[in-house]
Amino acid sequence: MKAVETQAEYLIKEKDFPTLLKTLLKEGMVDKIIGAEAKVSKKSGEVDRFSISPKLWEKPEEIESFPVSNLITYGYARTDSASKFLHASADGAKNEKIALIARPCDTRALIELSKIKQVNLDNLFIIGIEDRGMTLNVSRELRSEKDLDTTKIVKEKITDDGLLFLLDDGKTKKVGIEIADNCSRCIRKQPIIADISISDIGIPIEDENIILKVHSDAASELIDKLGIKADKIPSDIKKTHEDKMAEILKAAEEKRAKDLEEWNKLSQKEKLEQLQKCTM
């Protein structure tokens, strides 16, 4: 399946993303939004920025913030996904209009769910994510990083050679955490259905902007109603983004081919042993 076609491209401030979500509710474009929030420890009350859960919003005032860079980088906690939450907690948008933020793999799952009448695609406003993939078990992996105070992290970004953090003093810190193995060989880095998509690919971590792409007439209508500054994407940033996306896809295709070649060399017993392992 091909990625969804793009009508227009903008830069918006990451901090303005909640306004976009609020506008969907205020203008009656959707009845509910499947948003996201960082989990809070029941013991300490501390926010865990590495563990993100879906959350259902019905009123604009419920949306105070949104963990954009967290969701792009970590995805939802392992047992959650946008498509699963939509089906289980929002009745598959069968009788209400629902907005949700979906990774490329979520958009494929939505199509499959619609085939068995578990999701009504016509009632969805989909905000897709263009991404490299996501990192797993970051909180656990960072325990060995003695010189990194995780309470100082204000933003995160997956790079070519690890996970980069922006700290509250403006400094950055990179650690050797790569995307999940399955993500590294996935060649679907863009949503195949979406009204809007967002991406941080090609944008430096210090930059306050994210890329926003419009894919539908409903999304164009939303942009007109936003009341925030949405600048057409400059040609240099557009080229950097597109070049990096092409580079990421090429690397994924090469990894996929290499892994398939190695898989075909395995015996039946070895293949069964590999399938029994958890790869995510």
Question: What are the roles of these predicted feature ranges?
Answer:
Residues E270-M280:
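An accessory alpha-helical subdomain
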Residues M1-E261, Q268-K271:
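Iron-sulfur-associated redox domains of electron-transfer enzymes in respiratory
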